[in-house]
Structures are given as C-alpha cells and as structure tokens.
C-alpha cells in the first residue's frame, strides 16, 4: 500500500456515502480487496465522537425514517491529538451529504455541555470510539472502522459496549458511482 498524506479534495462539497456493516470474522476479505491497489491517506487513528440529540431523540428518529433532509451534530477528536476537538454538523440532502467542521476551544469532552442549533436545544446522547483506516481506491475514499466501542449518555459511570462489527464506508463525489 502506498501512503499519501495530502487530503483528497472533492470538486464540490456534496458527496454520496455508502455504508456497509459486517462481522469481524468476515471483514478480512473486504480489507484485502480495499488494500489491493489502494493508497493509504492517513495513518490508522482512533476517532472519538460525542453525538447530540433532542430529549425525544428527534435527530435519531429522522435518520431512521427519513432518507434525506436530516442532520447530525457531533463533537469529534482524534485520540492522537486529544486537545483538538471539532464541532461538526453533517447534513444529508437530496444532493448528497455536506459536512461543516469547526475547531473549538474545548480540551476534553467533559467541558462540553448542551448546545443550541437553529433555535433548538440539543444534549449529549452517545459517545463512540473506533479505529479508522483511510484509503483511496479508484478515486473513491474508503474508510474502514474497527474496535468500535460505545456508550449511551456521557456519564463516565455508563458502561461501554464492544461491537463485533466492522463498518466500511465509500465516500464518492456527485460524479462517481459505486
């Protein structure tokens, strides 16, 4: 695998994303296919995200029942640089997905409280951590997520759960097809 540090910049801000979930036991064949003739975009790193929602989980419900015109709010960092936390809003429209990301002054997730967005109050609802690998294959960006752990809520007393799944995601600009 070649290693490439420069980021892939899409021609526009919208992209299509296709997500596949598989068991760890079956994931090796997919990783073999991905790594063959691909370029490694970044070193493997640990992603940590805190997701926000309303008290009645309206964002989650929209993501389950609506295919477009929805959004996610999260704070994210990379374990290798924990002092950098980003606020991200990921919107899904008929044209594709669009993500905004802005650096914050937070030093850890415990400092982040509730937030207002578009006149609505949102609360931290779940925390997830996973190891991510980033590849470029045939002009498509592919992410490969393993070691997934998660907990509901943000209280440190809440139990973490381990997932035996691997998530593979293809990220394509408008002109590409899977």
Regions found by a protein language model. Give the residues of each.
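Phosphate-end processing signature that detects enzymes handling 5′-triphosphorylated RNA
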Residues: 2-178
């Amino acid at each position: 695998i070649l290693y490439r540090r420069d980021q892939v910049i899409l021609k526009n801000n919208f992209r299509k994303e296709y997500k596949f979930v598989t068991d760890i036991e079956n994931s090796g064949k997919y990783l073999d296919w991905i790594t063959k003739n691909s370029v490694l975009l970044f070193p493997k790193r640990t992603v940590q995200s805190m997701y926000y929602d309303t008290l009645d989980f309206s964002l989650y419900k929209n993501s389950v029942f609506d295919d477009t015109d929805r959004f996610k709010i999260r704070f994210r960092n990379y374990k290798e640089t924990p002092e950098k936390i980003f606020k991200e809003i990921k919107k899904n429209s008929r044209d594709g997905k669009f993500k905004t990301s802005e650096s914050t002054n937070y030093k850890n997730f415990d400092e982040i409280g509730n937030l207002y967005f578009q006149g609505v109050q949102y609360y931290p609802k779940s925390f997830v951590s996973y190891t991510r690998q980033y590849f470029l294959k045939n002009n498509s960006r592919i992410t490969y997520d393993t070691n997934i752990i998660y907990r509901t809520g943000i209280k440190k007393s809440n139990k973490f759960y381990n997932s035996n799944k691997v998530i593979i995601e293809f990220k394509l600009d408008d002109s590409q097809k899977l």
